[in-house]
Amino acid sequence: KFTLRFLFTPLVHWPETMITYLEEEEIMFSCDAFGSYGSLDGVLFDDEAKDQLPFYEKEALRYYTNIVAAFSRNTLMAIEKAAAYPFKIIAPSHGLIWREDPMRIVSLYQKWAEYATKPTEPGVTVLFGTMYRNTERAMEACLQTIKSEGVPIEVFNVSTVHPSFMLPSLWTKKGVLIACPTYERAMFPAMVHALDIAEIKSVKNKIAGYFGSYA
């Protein structure tokens, strides 16, 4: 005999999302909550991937910022519901199954969800676009100044990097620097797309700067 409890956790990230709790085995089948990107490459559980955990945790952050971040309030509510039950295993629909240290992924999700309203990490995310390298040269001068202050930086060329790889840095870092030229009297199209995605994913409350050149 097995007993399943269904914990309604709407908008993590679908309206009908539920966590299914198997009482006898203390397993949380958490659906999209606590999931991650990343090919499992022959492993299934966290204890089988110890050497690869930094990769999977990085991919979990990328998954969070792309799939769940816009619903961070709901994520915190889901964590609170799950905490009411003892669990030995977290088994999400995507990514590693956490059986050795299930609280590891729960604590990471808690931290990332709280970034929606609480202070984030020191550092600057730099998004740049360039056509004739004029904006890029100006950006390089800015980067030297920021680096001289010991501030962590991540730099993304919006013309060559998919926005899904920009979002983790945008979500976790306190500062954003945007550098791009104009394009026919408007913002560089690739930058428009990157910023639209950031807005959709609820990236906000940042210290931001902007500069560019015109054509």
Model-assigned labels for residue ranges:
Residues 89-123:
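Terminal amphipathic helices with adjacent charged low-complexity linkers/tails
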Residues 135:
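Glycine-rich phosphate/diphosphate-binding loop of Rossmann-like nucleotide-binding domains
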Residues 30, 93, 127-129, 156, ...:
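Short hydrophobic segments within beta-strands
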